Design a protein with these regions (language model features):
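Pepsin/retropepsin-fold aspartyl endopeptidases
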Residues: 1-118
Length: 118
């Protein structure tokens, strides 16, 4: 697992407005996680619920939605888990793959990833 931080802009699927945040890039997490109050402020409502495995162990049901993210000049719609009120924003492996990015383990920065096909 590799971690670093990245400035991103978070918005609803229609891209009508964005909130800048510094997100933890965590390749051990599957999806993006954003604090629920921030998502609500942006007008993002949960679309579905599902079970998630928690880092310290155990699992719980959480709400999910699709959000619009901007990283640099690139924009993409990704799956996001509604975090707790004080959750740190997180970019997970699914988010990085959607943007075609990976973590450069030497620098901790995000770099283009090679896509693999069967």
């Amino acid at each position: 697992m590799t971690t670093s931080h990245q400035q991103v802009h978070v918005g609803p699927r229609d891209g009508s407005r964005y909130q800048p945040v510094i997100a933890l890039v965590n390749t051990g997490s599957t999806y993006a996680v954003m604090p629920s109050p921030m998502l609500s402020m942006l007008g993002i409502d949960p679309y579905w619920t599902g079970m998630v495995e928690l880092g310290p162990g155990g699992s719980e049901e959480r709400s999910f939605a699709e959000i619009r993210l901007r990283i640099g000049d690139a924009e993409c719609t990704v799956v996001c888990v509604f975090g707790q009120q004080d959750s740190q924003p997180v970019l997970g492996s699914h988010t990085l793959q959607a943007f075609g990015l990976q973590v450069d383990t030497a620098t901790g920065g995000l770099v283009p990833a090679r896509a693999f096909l069967p």
